[in-house]
Amino acid sequence: MDENKKRALAAALGQIEKQFGKGAVMRMGDHDRQAIPSISTGSLGLDIALGIGGLPKGRIVEIYGPESSGKTTLTLSVIAAAQRMGSTCAFVDAEHALDPDYAGKLGVNVDDLLVSQPDTGEQALEITDMLVRSNAVDVIIVDSVAALVPKAEIEGEMGDAHVGLQARLMSQALRKITGNIKNANCLVIFINQIRMKIGVMFGSPETTTGGNALKFYASVRLDIRRTGAVKEGDEVVGSETRVKVVKNKVAPPFRQAEFQILYDQAFYRNGEIIDLGVQQGLVEKSGAWYAYKGSKIGQGKANAAKYLEENPEIGQEIEQQIRAKLLVTSANTKATPVAEDLADADI
C-alpha cells in the first residue's frame, strides 16, 4: 500500500475509533486466532462430524427433522453436557411438552434448569433475548419454531388467514438477537419441524417452518432422521438415528453421523467409541472379538461396550485418541474461512 493510502486509512480508522470507540475496527493479524469453543452434543460421532467437537458457542444452531426423530433428545443431551461443565441452561418450551422425568433420565439436572412456557411467539423470543443479554446463560433451547405463534394469530378467529406473520416475527427477532448472542458467547438452539411444499415436481418437497431467516442466521443446521429401531428380542428399546450437517460455518459441512438413541440413556456412547475405535485402528477386531492394546475386551459389540462401561477410564482414553485424530485443532483453524464460504455456497 502506498503512503497516501496508508495515511488515508489511518485517518479513517482514527475517525471511526473516535466516533464509535476503540475496537470498532480491528486488524485480524493483531490478535491470535483461537479455536471456537464448543459444547458436546453427547454423541462422539456427531461431535466429530461437526468438526470442532460439538456445537459452537456464541452462535445460532437449527435442529430439524420429522416427528419422533430425536430432536428434543439431542438438545437435552446438549444441556446435560453443558451442565456437567458448570454452565447455566434454559429451555423455552413453546410446545408446552417438556417431560422433566425424561430429561432427568438423560442426565439433565432439572432442579437447575431454567424453564419458560410462554403464551405467544413474541413473548418466547423476548424472553430468549433477555436471557441472552443477561450474559449469565450459556445454552438456550427454543422448542420449537413451529410453536412460536404470533399474538395476532392467537387473538384472531380460527381459520383467519395470517400470511407471513411467523416468518416476519422470526426475521425481526433474529436480526435483534444475533449480535447479543455473539457478545454473550451463548449457544442458542432452535428446534424446527418439517412441512411439505405443495406442487413440487423436482427436488425435495420438504421445508422448515418460520420462513428463511433462520436458515441464514444459523451457523450450524442439523437434519436428524430416524432410520430404524433398536430391539432386544421383540421389544423396541431405541432408535437408529442419522444426523446430517447440512450447513456449517465453523468447519467443513455435509458430514453425517449415525448412532443409536436408547430410550433410557440417550446416546449409546460406548457403542460409538467401539465403532470409531475400530475405524481408526485403535481397537482391534478379530471375528466377533474386540481387543484394545492386545487385551480382549469382549465378544460382540454389546459385551465390548459393557466392558467400557465397567472401565470408564479405558473408554475415556480411546475417546481422547479418537478426538485427537479426527477433530479440527487450533493449529489448523486457518481452514475456517473456507468452511464458512462453503456453507453459504449454493451446492
Swiss-Prot record:
Known outcome of mutating residue 273 to V: In strain: ATCC 17587
Tell me what effect the entry lists for residue 316 to R.
In strain: ATCC 17587
Q: Which UniProt keywords apply?
A: ATP-binding, Cytoplasm, DNA damage, DNA recombination, DNA repair, DNA-binding, Nucleotide-binding, SOS response
Please state where this protein is localized: Cytoplasm
Question: Where is the signal peptide, in residue numbers?
Answer: none
Q: Name one GO cellular component term.
A: cytosol
GO annotation terms (biological process): DNA recombination; DNA repair; SOS response
The UniProt GO MF terms for this protein read: ATP binding; ATP hydrolysis activity; ATP-dependent DNA damage sensor activity; damaged DNA binding; single-stranded DNA binding
Supply the Gene3D superfamilies for this chain.
P-loop containing nucleotide triphosphate hydrolases
Consequence of substituting residue 87 to A: In strain: ATCC 17587
Where, in this chain's numbering, is ATP bound? 65-72
The record ties this protein, via SMART domains, to:
AAA
Function of the molecule: Can catalyze the hydrolysis of ATP in the presence of single-stranded DNA, the ATP-dependent uptake of single-stranded DNA by duplex DNA, and the ATP-dependent hybridization of homologous single-stranded DNAs. It interacts with LexA causing its activation and leading to its autocatalytic cleavage.
- Sorted alphabetically, which HAMAP family does this protein's record hold? RecA
Tell me the protein family, please: Belongs to the RecA family.
Name it: Protein RecA
- What gene does this protein come from? recA
